[in-house]
């Protein structure tokens, strides 16, 4: 039995609750840099740094293997707020025991757009980041929050990926097990997350009312060993360690002893995801229509976490409208040297978290949404996001209108200057006398001004006529 441990590493650029009207740039107006720095460094100290250091030890001592999907917006914040975190991830990749899984740079919902160009653009941006920061070329792709359908799988396959990750949910499997490799109708290999075994760590580890509490490394290894199939893919938020479950819960001790306990079961082997793809053959086909798109979010495991209510859908449609407007006016914005700044902000606004905060689901799902949100209520999140969208749109339109106004003024000023110059020329001709001096070879043209001075203008060969 092959085992993979996979972790999502992501931090969004959280937006200001109120637009900063004193901001000199779009970033200062819309992005809460202070809050982002506070959150990033808090999570770095509680999760990223201790977990990375521990996994480096586990690799060194037990040849442990893990896989990460690291978003571009996370890397941007690491570079700005805490480069030691990024250095640790680089060290992990250099061990050769860590595989990076590709995803969307901005952790966006572009895969749900009508056209695929922005989705592909976000993936290619992410690929470029992996190459520049880590010197790594990813072979396996996972979409934002494991959002998946046949179309998404085909796009990933066309981009050259060997396999794609998604949720091993019953509605796509029926009676089948998630513990095998599958393929899409287009032949893209599919890795399925075992959500029960993943959530045992990710959500239930510190739940004292859980009938399996406390979860120990030896107990979990026994569960893995007794699970039938060919591969178990464990996938969770990296902040599981130290942030969602604090150090005091014993989560780090669990992770420290997990490789030791797994090694006690000879038929278990911890591998990287590309090894699974290379060593196993697909056991069947998974068909997921666009209208039945799945994800790993909430109990429904569909896209309702981001598009489940009217507020979210209004926000999503407005965002797409602004994107179309920016593209239609891209050449004008480039001439104004404003396109890059505007397009980057548009990309930041695409991050799925902005719509996730607007969910109004109940019970356990709502508590998870609230946990991640920096807004008091989903309605505050909606009002703030829509306010930024409309302000952003107004800024672009005002910029273009001012440019057109200035252009028209320059045209009018140019016309007035032309007319003025024309009048001066006419006056000049009236107040001057033209004298022609000829010799055998050339004729010289002189203009005699009002003071009687002769100014030679040019010479011309024969045939010159003055009317």
From Swiss-Prot:
GO BP: carbohydrate metabolic process
One GO MF term: alpha-amylase activity
Q: Name one Pfam family in it.
A: Glyco_hydro_57
Please name every pair of cysteines joined by a disulfide bond in this record. none
Catalysed reaction(s) here are: Endohydrolysis of (1->4)-alpha-D-glucosidic linkages in polysaccharides containing three or more (1->4)-alpha-linked D-glucose units
Q: Which UniProt keywords apply?
A: Carbohydrate metabolism, Glycosidase, Hydrolase
Family annotation (Gene3D superfamilies): 3.20.110.20
Active-site residues annotated for this sequence = 145 (nucleophile)
**What family is it from?**
Belongs to the glycosyl hydrolase 57 family.
Q: What is this protein called?
A: Putative alpha-amylase
